[in-house]
């Protein structure tokens, strides 16, 4: 039986290997218009060996309402996935997220994607501050909002003009400041994340500012989940119960509490020890009821029932004793001896470490720390039919799995604009050199500190193997890694393992992936022939031509009329002409292309972020650098002559309104969208899944050049043929278009006025611009090799001093590189993250002094 269990795990890993993804960025916060530089580390989920089986990694920038703004596609160059995410100059200030994944990861769902929070500000965020006070009514059905504005330097109240604020349905409404210099709103308590974000824009002293502000949950809302160790609570014995308290925002809530019985007698006291987590010990008999009375820091008290104990129950218990892990089988007091067989399976990431029938003569089984690998270890107790009956997670750190990474510079201190020589050494625990590669970020600590809430250690070894959101995972990996953080065991008691379905593996019923790894670009579709062009046409020729890239291909359809061109890849913005013909070369066929689909965006758990203290000073400096590199910003309306202010746009249609949202051809060009579906999906408030388009969960009216169009027909229009798009809310759409527009309207005006289809494209020809890979671009780091360069009067105001995602160690485990310091005296923060070729994590931090 033990051999078959191990064989089942091996079979599962071969049929369905999984991936892990971690993404490092050059810094934690940006100013509008800056590029977000990143490196993606893609590994095999079991071995952690770097893996490029998936040819592409997708990176998306999501706004605070979880709507897509940009998407880029990265391919490996010399085994390295590196790229950048451009941000628009006029992007609203707020808390954004990077969402990164491969197509193959969609098999496991969005929980397996990597997300990272980034803060984006605009220059006016350094000058003016928007203050918001939120107060919920007693029944929590409404929230009253007070808004006012101040100048940061003086603290004085300011009175902006043309203030636009988003309504609950996403529409913008103009507001005026009251006599007390405030704006007052009252609205229904937000039901979802999209309506839990305020969008505010205004003018002040001929400057234009816009930002997102989250609407918090009520302060007195919190919940506590209680989880018995091993998942069961055997009656008549002392058992541990782990608990986790979170507030309505989804983040940790520190609590204290007591356990009481049905009579109200106090039995024990407990308190959270780390990020809302803790444990308590109980003793109960069948039928007894116990309750936890919990109190948070706001003195809000709540009562929760504790899990009930049951007779004839077994459960796993685990505890560390020095460097020894003991796994015990706890039995309810009515079980004097086990009458049925149980099997204990212990594995780490699917690699079976132990699988044996439980020996009834033993109270516990012991594992030495050095025998276990580093990472999340799952112990599973299964019955004779291989049904899991109890589970316990533990976390182990094995010194032999860790790398020793040393970072040093040639000198302890450097001057401005001086060459800084760096050396990195990577060895195993015994001092043997290791080959690998890593990315390095060097930032000015006076401007911004590195994000300390997540790193490659915490992601690869911990968070990627656990269910649910792990708040501030890097907090478990500070200091001496050989001594586990005391909060780790609490985390193991309150989270679940999230990779394979263990029950199916134990029974020899492995899962299989529905989506295979993406190995190349693909253009696919179907050709239909016959009298009415409705029947799948077998063995019909299909030809593909790239108009702005050297690529041609041809093939024939299969018996179902389908075709798929693979084995090629092109950079972004390449246009293809695809033509289908009948066997005689005639054009009387209809060609239908498959539309590239991307995973939906669902509400995410709140992500932690640190290092953005003093962000306002940083933005002033970053803005000055931006203008040195790019010229005057468009938001500075006072210094440049602009006839039409960007704050209120009115379309060209006779029924256009400034209350609608308008996207001009210039706006559309900035999105770099490849088809109408991806274009509309990047417009806030519009949801696109395949060809289905919804606004507030209902399908809107779609008009193209004043003609109603089905959403499935939008593939005929290219974004570059669109002159403007105007989004009507349900109320304004109903006024102009009647009953058919009760769900709102999307009004598209093309440049040629013929539905954007030049000369009416034939049925057998389609033109598309699919998402291609992002061409490589190198981070610019200036050199000061000559006296002329060193004396250049142009200030060097870099906030990211150096970014290099492609550093590899030599055979001796070392790597050297250099860069020049900037013009500011400061301590530089260094972050190094990567993987060795045999699957060990490379991570260290350092400092550089510049005087």
Task: Mark where each language-model region is.
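Surface-exposed, low-complexity/disordered segments
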Residues: 12-16, 27, 31, 52, ...
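Extended, solvent-exposed regions of the mature portions of secreted/cell-surface glycoproteins
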Residues: 62, 342-355, 385-388, 392
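Ligand-binding face of N-terminal immunoglobulin V-set domains in extracellular IgSF glycoproteins
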Residues: 81-87
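Short strand-turn-strand beta-turns centered on an Asx-Gly dipeptide
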Residues: 168-169, 262, 703-706
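Periplasmic plug
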Residues: 691-731, 755-764
């Amino acid at each position: 039986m033990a051999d078959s269990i191990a064989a089942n795990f091996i079979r599962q890993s071969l049929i369905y290997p999984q991936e892990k993804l971690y993404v490092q960025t050059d810094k934690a916060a940006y100013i509008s218009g800056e590029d977000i530089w990143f490196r993606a580390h893609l590994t095999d989920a079991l071995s952690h060996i770097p893996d490029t089986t998936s040819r592409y990694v997708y990176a998306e920038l999501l706004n605070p309402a979880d709507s897509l703004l940009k998407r880029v596609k990265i391919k490996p160059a010399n085994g390295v996935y590196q790229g950048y995410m451009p941000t628009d100059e006029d992007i609203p200030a707020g808390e954004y997220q990077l969402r990164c994944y491969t197509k193959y990861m969609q098999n496991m769902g969005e929980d397996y994607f990597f997300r990272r929070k980034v803060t984006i500000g605009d220059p006016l965020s350094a000058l003016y501050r928007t203050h918001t006070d939120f107060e919920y009514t007693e029944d929590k059905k409404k929230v009253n909002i007070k808004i006012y504005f101040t100048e940061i330097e003086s603290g004085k109240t300011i009175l902006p003009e043309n203030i636009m604020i988003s309504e609950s349905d996403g529409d913008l409404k103009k507001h005026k400041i009251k006599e007390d210099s405030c704006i007052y709103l009252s609205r229904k308590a937000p039901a979802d994340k999209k309506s839990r974000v305020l969008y505010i824009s205004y003018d002040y002293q001929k400057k234009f500012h816009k930002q997102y502000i989250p609407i918090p949950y009520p302060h007195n809302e919190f919940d506590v989940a209680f989880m018995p160790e091993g998942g069961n609570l055997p009656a008549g014995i002392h058992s541990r119960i782990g608990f986790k308290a979170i507030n309505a925002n989804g983040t940790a809530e520190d609590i204290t509490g007591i356990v009481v019985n049905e009579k109200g007698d106090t039995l024990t006291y407990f308190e959270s020890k780390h990020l809302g987590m803790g444990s308590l010990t109980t003793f109960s008999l069948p039928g007894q009821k116990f309750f936890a009375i919990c109190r948070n820091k706001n003195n809000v008290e709540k009562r929760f029932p504790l899990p009930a104990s049951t007779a004839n129950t077994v459960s796993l218990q685990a505890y560390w004793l020095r460097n020894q892990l003991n796994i015990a089988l706890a039995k309810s007091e009515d079980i004097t001896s086990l009458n049925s067989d149980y099997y204990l399976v212990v594995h780490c990431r699917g690699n079976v470490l132990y699988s044996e029938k439980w020996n009834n003569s033993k109270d516990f089984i012991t594992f030495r720390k050095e025998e276990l690998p580093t990472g999340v270890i799952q112990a599973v107790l299964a019955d004779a039919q291989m049904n899991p009956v109890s589970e316990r997670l533990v976390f182990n750190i094995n010194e032999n799995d860790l790398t020793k990474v040393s970072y040093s510079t040639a000198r302890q201190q450097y001057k401005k604009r001086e060459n800084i020589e760096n050396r990195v050494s990577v060895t195993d625990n015994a001092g043997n050199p290791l080959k690998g590669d890593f990315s390095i970020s060097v930032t000015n600590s006076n401007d911004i500190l590195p994000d300390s809430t997540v790193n490659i250690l915490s992601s690869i070894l911990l968070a990627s193997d656990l269910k649910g959101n792990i708040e501030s995972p890097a907090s478990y990996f500070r200091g001496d890694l050989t001594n586990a953080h005391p909060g780790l065991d609490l985390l193991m008691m309150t989270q679940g393992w999230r990779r394979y379905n263990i029950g199916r593996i134990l029974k020899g019923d492995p899962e299989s992936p529905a989506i295979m790894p993406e190995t190349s670009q693909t253009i696919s579709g179907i050709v239909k022939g016959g009298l009415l062009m409705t029947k799948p046409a077998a063995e019909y020729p299909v030809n593909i031509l790239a108009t702005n890239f050297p690529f041609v291909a041809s093939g024939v359809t299969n018996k179902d009329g389908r075709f798929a061109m693979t084995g090629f890849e092109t950079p972004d913005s390449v246009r293809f002409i695809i033509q289908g013909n009948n066997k005689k070369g005639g054009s009387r066929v209809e060609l239908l292309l498959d539309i590239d689909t991307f995973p939906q965006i669902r509400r995410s758990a709140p992500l932690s972020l640190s290092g953005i203290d003093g962000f306002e000073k940083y933005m002033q400096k970053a803005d000055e650098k931006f203008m040195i590199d790019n010229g005057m910003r468009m938001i500075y309306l006072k210094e440049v002559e602009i006839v039409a202010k960007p704050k209120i746009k009115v379309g060209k249609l006779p029924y256009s309104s400034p209350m609608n949202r308008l996207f001009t051809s210039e706006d559309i060009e900035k999105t770099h969208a490849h088809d109408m579906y991806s274009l509309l999906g990047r417009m806030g408030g519009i949801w696109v899944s395949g060809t289905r388009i919804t606004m507030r969960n209902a399908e809107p009216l779609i008009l193209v050049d004043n003609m109603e169009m089905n959403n499935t027909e939008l593939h005929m229009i290219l974004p570059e043929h669109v002159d403007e798009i105007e989004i009507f809310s349900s109320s304004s759409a109903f006024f102009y278009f009647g009953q058919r527009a009760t769900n709102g309207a999307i009004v598209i005006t093309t440049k040629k006025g013929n539905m954007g289809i030049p000369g009416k494209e034939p049925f057998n020809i389609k033109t598309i611009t699919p998402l291609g890979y992002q061409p490589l671009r190198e981070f610019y780091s200036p050199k000061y090799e000559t006296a002329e360069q060193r004396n250049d009067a142009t200030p060097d105001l870099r906030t990211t001093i150096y970014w290099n995602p492609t550093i590899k160690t030599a055979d001796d485990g070392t790597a050297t590189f250099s860069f020049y310091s900037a013009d500011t005296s400061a301590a530089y923060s260094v972050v190094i993250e990567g993987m060795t070729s045999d699957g060990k994590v490379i991570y260290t931090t350092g400092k550089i002094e510049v005087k």
